[in-house]
Amino acid sequence: MTSADFDIVGQHYSSLRRPDPRIAKIIHAELMDAESIINIGAGTGSYEPPGKTITAVEPSETMIAQRVDKENTTVFCASAENLPFESNSFDAAMAILTIHHWSNWQKGLQEALRVTKSKIILFTWIGMPEKFWLSDYFPEIKYIDKDLFPSLEQLSTVLGDVKVTSVPIPKDCTDGFMCAYWSRPTSYLDSRIRSAISTFSRIPNLEKGITKLKQDLANGKWFEKYGYLQSLHEFDFGYRLVVSDKQFA
């Protein structure tokens, strides 16, 4: 997805893609020792840890315009594949649910390695669980995003040895990415919510799935089949924190 695409689908990111504090805690723990951090594909600035010197890189002017001004933060309109910085400029790099939007993820990671002295933190996704109910209504999600996100094995070909941590998604997740509303099915009927989830912009014949979901919620079929999910507090939907550290080498 290009910066021009995000100038359209990213219009409500700041209100709908608010960082979830439980996910933030996991990300920030890995960045604790870094003083200077580059946030690649920074979007509106979600998950940037406080108290650090942040350099945010984002190609979309629409996303940049939604950022809240923060102390010790500098924003550059640039792409992951061509970072305008000298080698070893930053202690660490972070890239949060962004790598699938890069035009060349291998080059983007090579650039991250070049400008970073130590850690690279990726929050990414490794594929849809077989039993996630959303694929009943939008079967395309099983492969649309999976073809865009590199696998852990592919990431390792560029990053070398990595540490991988599962990140379960809370039932009341405040960051409105694709699986965030797994326990709140009516949310997917809201076009504004869908507008902040890039996956939906790539699904053909979207209204067919919306209509079926609306019907199943109205007649109780969804609750008969999946109502048990609403008693769970969190669920693993394939989101992972991947950490590359030059000290691993």
Regions found by a protein language model. Give the residues of each.
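Class I SAM-dependent methyltransferase SAM/SAH-binding core
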Residues: 38-82
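A conserved beta-strand element that flanks and buttresses the S-adenosyl-L-methionine
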Residues: 94
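Short catalytic micro-motifs in class I SAM-dependent methyltransferases
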Residues: 97-101
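A short glycine-rich, Lys/Arg-flanked "PGG" loop and its adjoining helix->strand segment in the class I
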Residues: 106-120
